[in-house]
Amino acid sequence: MLNNTNVNNGDLVSRVSRQMRISRILIITFFIAYTLITLFPIYALFIRSFVGTKHATDLWLTPPPLEEASMDYQWGSLSVFYNLDSEKAKADLGIPADAYIQSRWTLARIAKEYDIPEQKIKDYFTPYSVYSGWIVLFTDNKFWPALFRTILITGLSLFGLNILSIMTGFGLAGLRRRDQMFVFNLYLLSAVVPLMMILLPQYMIVQWLLNLIPGYGVSGSTIRNVSQIAAIVVLNIKGGALGTMIYTGFISTIPKELGEAAEIDGASILQYFRHIVLPLLKVPIATLTVMVLPSLWNEFMGPYIYLDANNTTLLPLIQSYTGTYTTNYQVSYTGIFVSIIPLIIIYILFRNWFIQGAMSGAIKG
């Protein structure tokens, strides 16, 4: 009887162990599939950056092969479809800078007119069939300044938004007085006001204030460029309802006894804020950062309206590559892919910090 019981127990343990292994395999398979499905759009976007306008309606899972440039291509068509920098192309091919090339001239005629070997022209234009987006984007002298301005505006906006939200949350923490509740409700009210409702008056006020700055009217001046960037940062950090909610809720959970003990020890409010409150705010800082970083980085409307074309950020620059009659989709896809790389790098480097903030929800339990 004892042996039979041991056998039955062994079979039961074996079945449970087998079921657990199967469950573990299914769970791992599910998460692998989910990860692949999540990453596929990024992979598809990367592949599309190599697919020219000619094949824009086709589905490609790998980069297409290079297509040798035909000598029947017209100069004007290449300029439109490849966003070709005519002056740079003429310099690279050895064509005089003051030479006038008609848009209907074929590459064969250009080779004959300026005594250029046909193979040299083919070798020059063939990479454009696949790498047009990358060539145009990284040789455009507007791209790197636009990337720098995007990083600058995002960084300053994040810093300013966190600082102002922390100070507001510290002032409203506890909501013990009626005036504190009134101010807190005003912040919440600002979150439900549509941007389009205040866009025009906001634009008029900002332009009026900017025009008060000496030298702002000079196009391309440093004062004008810096003032426009400062205006974008101020608009990004004003009225942070989300940050106020997060920091007010978190700071309210800090025991009052800490403040009373600091006061007894002779600490001022500023010292209490700096040495006790601030070190406890790592989690809400991560929470607010992970929630607003994508929207700040991908902001289009503000820079498009308030920044000049030579002082813009990434997304308006990418939009400027869209033509009136045709669009080089390689440039658009390449620009979008490049614009998300910094975000991916940031989330990879600070993933533990962000996960901690997202899981805790900035509420101390």
Which sequence ranges carry the predicted segments?
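Short, solvent-exposed alpha-helical "recognition" segments
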Residues: I95-I101, V283
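Compact, charge-rich alpha-helical regulatory domains located at protein termini
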Residues: Y73-S77, Y100-W105
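Amphipathic, charged-and-aliphatic alpha-helical interface segments
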Residues: E87-A97
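A hydrophobic, multi-pass inner-membrane permease signature
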Residues: L2-S70, S77, F81, A91, ...
